[in-house]
């Protein structure tokens, strides 16, 4: 059963009506855009959202393994493990995944933006990008806290290395620049190597 905010949100999603040989057919706008190989990654990156994105990526691969997929990102970030599920699927499937930042791509959102196919990562002109180190908090016995601290440090090093690979920046620059919240304009993100270009007009 849907909770009240979710049902209100779903009621606000526009519907598109199409004429087919079998009569009229209606889609919500996101399902219609999925037919055009467009996926929206919007809001907090968490497990449920990640599963939906992964399912859409796999579905579009099964439909046409040689056609690009377009992933539009407007996200403040979120769970590292959920984000890595999306990232690994982007790298795993055959189609190139072109990423486009609309609004913001922060934290894990920025990581997924940078993880798009080389030459096919873009920002719109007034979008913002933010990179930083992973956040973590844990309560419990001292030995368990130490274990979790080591895990977070390991994740931090792995994410930094992957960002270095995608941006072409040296590892020491990535480590310095992710030490605190680091905000960039679209042009700065392109200069840094997080994206390949800033798009003001289609085509």
Curated annotation (Swiss-Prot):
Signal peptide: none annotated. The active site is at 107 (nucleophile), 132. It catalyses: Hydrolysis of proteins to small peptides in the presence of ATP and magnesium. alpha-casein is the usual test substrate. In the absence of ATP, only oligopeptides shorter than five residues are hydrolyzed (such as succinyl-Leu-Tyr-|-NHMec, and Leu-Tyr-Leu-|-Tyr-Trp, in which cleavage of the -Tyr-|-Leu- and -Tyr-|-Trp bonds also occurs). Keywords: Cytoplasm, Hydrolase, Protease, Serine protease. CDD domains: S14_ClpP_2 (cd07017). It is found in: Cytoplasm. GO terms for molecular function: ATP-dependent peptidase activity; ATPase binding; serine-type endopeptidase activity. Its EC number is 3.4.21.92. InterPro entries: ClpP, ClpP/crotonase-like_dom_sf, ClpP/TepA, ClpP_His_AS, ClpP_Ser_AS. One of its GO terms (cellular component) is endopeptidase Clp complex. One of its GO terms (biological process) is protein quality control for misfolded or incompletely synthesized proteins. The keyword Secreted does not apply. Cleaves peptides in various proteins in a process that requires ATP hydrolysis. Has a chymotrypsin-like activity. Plays a major role in the degradation of misfolded proteins. This is ATP-dependent Clp protease proteolytic subunit. It comes from Shewanella sediminis (strain HAW-EB3).
